[in-house]
């Protein structure tokens, strides 16, 4: 099951343009594109049933179910796993396995601390710090997936993923909530939410539990490992056509498996259920196949340039957006215009963001962690 060294993979281009573009596409939604789309649809199609359907897709599900916007976060973690599969063998070759492992842990620590900072950790008391959040989950999941990929071959990674997903599901079926005796998936009354309320210090996003909580980080690691597996496939598939076919087929199989599991272990983003992992990873693979085919195989890439700008500095832009810098600039622009600010502000905000990302790219400023 274990491999003595990282698999030696065939040489590929140092950057896969579609991977950078899809990362930028994904981050663009996080940074405000969904708000801009909602504003435009509300403004120009207020009574359209189609517009209402689209608006619903740009919101998270309250609990069980799946929307397009529920894909955005796990897609980023999936792509982080792919990046590990591509970058780690090169780092091991240059610096050795121990140095690569130390780098993974250092990066995870930096992301964790940045996540605390993002949630106003420097201005609040210890009891008001949100210790778990988006950046913390990205750091932990990607580091864990990277460390696993240093130690395990592909078969070992598959077994580990299954163990994480099945083990997490078993907790909900076998371990009752001590305070209520409940087994299951009710919001606020399940084992994952209970562990958050009893173990995680500081401020929880939902007061008594957190959508980026402690137990639900385990299946998030599986999301990243599935990305590692996809990355290894890209490296070893042999031809662009086979790469695309494998991503499409594997993605659709995962989507089907996730929804087949849904009646027994529902698709719920806020506790990162195992069925949710499969559905999200499946659609992530399908999206990557489409981007890879269009950009890297067919060479139709000019349309993706704005996404490449964002994908080159995703974490830096995320932190700046969290400081409301782009929104404040958008509000100032909208305030000086004669149009209603309710829908103009989100448009101005994403425009400022794009212009700043373009400037960073033109100046070759790439902030890596």
Where are these regions (language model features)?
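Alpha-helical transmembrane segments and their immediate juxtamembrane cytosolic regions
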Residues: 1-369
């Amino acid at each position: 099951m274990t491999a003595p060294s990282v698999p030696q993979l065939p040489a590929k281009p140092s950057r896969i343009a579609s991977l950078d573009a899809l990362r930028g596409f994904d981050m663009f939604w996080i940074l405000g594109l969904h708000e801009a789309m909602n504003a435009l649809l509300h403004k120009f199609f207020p009574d359209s049933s189609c517009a209402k359907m689209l608006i619903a897709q740009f919101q998270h599900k309250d609990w069980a179910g799946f929307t397009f916007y529920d894909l955005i976060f796990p897609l980023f973690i999936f792509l982080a796993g792919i990046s590990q599969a591509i970058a780690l063998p090169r780092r091991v070759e240059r610096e050795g396995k121990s140095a690569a492992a130390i780098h993974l842990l250092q990066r995870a620590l930096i992301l964790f601390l940045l996540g605390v900072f993002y949630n106003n950790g420097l201005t609040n008391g210890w009891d008001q710090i949100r210790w778990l959040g988006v950046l913390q989950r990205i750091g932990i999941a990607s580091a864990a997936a990277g460390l696993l990929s240093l130690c395990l071959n592909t078969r070992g990674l598959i077994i580990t993923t299954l163990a994480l997903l099945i083990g997490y599901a078993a907790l909900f079926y076998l371990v009752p909530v001590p305070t209520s005796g409940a087994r299951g998936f009710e919001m606020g009354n399940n084992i994952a939410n209970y562990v958050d309320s009893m173990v995680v210090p500081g401020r929880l996003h939902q007061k008594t539990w957190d959508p980026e909580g402690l137990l639900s980080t385990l299946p998030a690691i599986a999301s990243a490992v599935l990305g590692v597996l996809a990355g290894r496939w890209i490296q070893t598939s042999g031809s662009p056509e086979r790469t695309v076919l494998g991503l499409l087929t594997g993605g659709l199989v995962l989507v089907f498996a996730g929804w087949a599991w849904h009646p027994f272990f529902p698709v719920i983003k806020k506790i990162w259920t195992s069925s949710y992992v499969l559905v999200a990873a499946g659609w992530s693979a399908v999206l990557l196949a489409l981007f890879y085919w269009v950009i890297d195989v067919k060479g139709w890439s000019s349309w993706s340039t704005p996404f490449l700008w964002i994908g080159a500095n995703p974490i830096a832009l995320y932190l700046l957006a969290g400081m409301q810098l782009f929104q404040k600039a958008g509000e100032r622009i909208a305030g000086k215009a004669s149009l209603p600010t309710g829908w103009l502000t989100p448009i101005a905000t994403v425009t400022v963001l794009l212009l700043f990302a373009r400037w960073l790219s033109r100046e070759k400023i790439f902030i890596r962690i």
